[in-house]
Swiss-Prot record:
Name of the protein: Uncharacterized protein C15orf39
Lineage: Eukaryota, Metazoa, Chordata, Craniata, Vertebrata
Biased segments, Pro residues type: 268-283
Record region (Disordered): 172-208, 236-283, 448-469, 482-504, 519-567, 668-690, 714-763, 931-1004, 1021-1047
Residues passing through the membrane, by range: none
Amino acid sequence: MAEKRPLRTLGPVMYGKLPRLETDSGLEHSLPHSVGNQDPCTYKGSYFSCPMAGTPKAESEQLASWTPYPPLYSTGMAGPPLQADNLLTNCLFYRSPAEGPEKMQDSSPVELLPFSPQAHSYPGPPLAAPKPVYRNPLCYGLSTCLGEGAVKRPLDVDWTLATGPLLPSADPPCSLAPAPSKGQTLDGTFLRGVPAEGSSKDSSGSFSPCQPFLEKYQTIHSTGFLASRYTGPYPRNSKQAMSEGPSSPWTQLAQPLGPPCQDTGPTHYPPPHHPPPHPPQALPCPPACRHPEKQGSYSPALPLQPLGGHKGTGYQAGGLGSPYLRQQAAQAPYIPPLGLDAYPYPSAPLPAPSPGLKLEPPLTPRCPLDFAPQTLSFPYARDDLSLYGASPGLGGTPPSQNNVRAVPQPGAFQRACQPLPASQPCSEPVRPAQEAEEKTWLPSCRKEKLQPRLSEHSGPPIVIRDSPVPCTPPALPPCARECQSLPQKEGARPPSSPPMPVIDNVFSLAPYRDYLDVPAPEATTEPDSATAEPDSAPATSEGQDKGCRGTLPAQEGPSGSKPLRGSLKEEVALDLSVRKPTAEASPVKASRSVEHAKPTAAMDVPDVGNMVSDLPGLKKIDTEAPGLPGVPVTTDAMPRTNFHSSVAFMFRKFKILRPAPLPAAVVPSTPTSAPAPTQPAPTPTSGPIGLRILAQQPLSVTCFSLALPSPPAVAVASPAPAPAPSPAPARAQAPASARDPAPAPAPVAGPAPASTSAPGDSLEQHFTGLHASLCDAISGSVAHSPPEKLREWLETAGPWGQAAWQDCQGVQGLLAKLLSQLQRFDRTHRCPFPHVVRAGAIFVPIHLVKERLFPRLPPASVDHVLQEHRVELRPTTLSEERALRELALPGCTSRMLKLLALRQLPDIYPDLLGLQWRDCVRRQLGDFDTEAGAVSSSEPTVARGEPESLALAQKSPAPKVRKPGRKPPTPGPEKAEAAAGEESCGASPTPATSASPPGPTLKARFRSLLETAWLNGLALPTWGHKSSRPDQPSPCPQLLDSQSHHL
């Protein structure tokens, strides 16, 4: 590479630290691949390779500055034989008009600006010029930008190549291509070509050694840079271009070097002060740009006067060269190529620095330290506006007469320079628009954008970063568009249409939440009211179990309407309560959506503020939920802030309270299923809600990591599961808690319980009633069957004796009803028993089966049935275990709290009944082995246990357990039970006593017992309970019958 170094001194500036020109792929999408894909900034070293467009030509004399290189540059590079002045101006070549059109596609924009970052590499062999390290940014070189005056570098050589076709010193903006994307350190001098010591007017001499480097730089950048930085090589709306290009100082600064986009090859290069033969139309910019009087056409950077007193036309034309080359004093007026500076600088209009201004590194204030800040969509480092007299934010101003308005041009350059009235600074008009655009969406991006701009304005010398890519720009162009609409739309909370869901290039439905939440209140209130009427309790419990999947409104309704619910079941009350929650929910959800989108910076700042303000609401809801006495409150609050599972989360995310039909659909099923359970007292639904919610709470609480609502809720839950406490108080308490915000720890049996308790008890009592009826029917059939037949059944029946016991009178119908009830619990997620919900599946503790439903069965027998069906018991988590114990099963061991899937209970239930039947037969036959003895001893327990299951309905204390000392009388009780069972099934009152005469005394005794039991309605009179049971009339049979009819 050393041999390729230009023979002439480049000056210290040239060898200052030069940032590498590396393409920023982030913005490539915006530019056509043709523009920059060919040669992404490949330059990684200290040399810039300048590919030569064509075979070496006689231009060598023109390239005299680069004595070794001129042959390398083809006419294509130099353009038509450039007049001496033209070639050297700004060290830029323009191709002959003829060549331009053909090569335009190839490298026209690139060739126009030797250093245009976007320029394509030239077909010719690449030249490696030492990478100039610009201690001073290009701006420094510009006398106009710095206003400093003559260059302090050896660049003082007169760079004012009158030839406008090269980079015009007066029109640095046009001359400068947005070449240095990574570093704007390339000084105008460098771009111009390191000041050729030869007079700038000698085009060949003036072609400084930097020119090849500049061209290579341009090539490198143009290929990679244009593609990556420029959204499109083709002119866009000036406004769009402004927003994209001007936004980045790179684009604006670089543009002067050369059009980042490929335009007609010649067009990009400023026309020689003496326009080259190529037709002016070839230039992307109107010919006006070429003419000094139209110098205003040079876009963002007004052509600065040639350094030090290069006033007059040279001032305009040499703007770039002059800024870079202080020698440019003699520069002839150059009209910036129209296509060179397509992007107006966002900075305020650059006042034209006096041509006599000295170019000094001190211009740093004018040089935007951070070019990236301005770049919205392009990584171009705008060549410092200071080169043009002012960097975008620096306040340097190119001559107003040179102001050019960027106009969309067909040329590769996105914008062509359009002459602006001399009075109208191009950068200012452009900047307002651009700023306006930025402001629209900057709220989120403003932080990033503003900082770069500040640095840009800061006075310190331009520090060219390796990647001048704007901090936010790469993603900003889309963001800007989206955000522009978003802030406006979000300003009005109910957007007319959902905002774009893309945030930070990530698709998200979060923005839709606000939109969806707006209509949510009406949609949800209707379904909610409808749901609440049929059975709000089921809806609430179901919704909670589902994690608020669309029934949340319903839940909220019941909970929200707690005060009203007890007295008012009307839709109005529910609607009001629902609307209130929804109103709260929508801000909360909006806040959550904003919260999710916050990192994206695409959200509007106001929204973020709202989010922050709303977050307290969320927090408050969470905190309130645990504190509130009633579980309903918890259900209302929890759904918003927490999710039972990923399913619930997805439901909230994609169906944010919006689905009016969903509540209707979900609730309809709930009400339909609920009516059967609630038949005894359809109206009182709040009571069951409390109970069910409590039952469901364990999971909710566990998942949410929330403390249980309050002692009242626990108290309510505990009475319900415990058969000993009268169910009435529990029911009363549940309604009270549901309706009363204040905790109601003490069970109060009031008129409310009467109305509301039935629904709560209906589900559990109905099921337990069915179960008790089944057990009674089985025991009754066994009791009045002859022992011979029983023994035959035991021998012939299958392992569980299903065939035998299923033939019992009424068993088939009751069993079908009970199984359907179990399936309904699972389907509707309304389990009356303490349970845990996992991933939408309900699990009940095995305690329900072993202790409540089949207390007489040995646990080993139950385990055997589970094994036969391959049913797996799942251990509870610590939180679930704690919740279950607190709510319903305080005395249960961990073994008894193992979880059984509710959906598997219908499969094993018939076999468990078979075990029950076998136990009855063994007891009836008096076959007492150790197990039988335990069973017989537990017989009283069974009798008691089943009533116990009905205890909620009976409101009677558990009967005493009688020791199994009396074996002789056991047959009598069996018969009595059988008779009672038959009677419950519809058999004649006391025919069973004659089934097997144990003895006259016992027979008479049991007959009396059966009669009294029948009169009293007891299904299972037992030997040990004869004294107390007859005295306690219990409507259990009637209740069972009515329930079964309803079923």
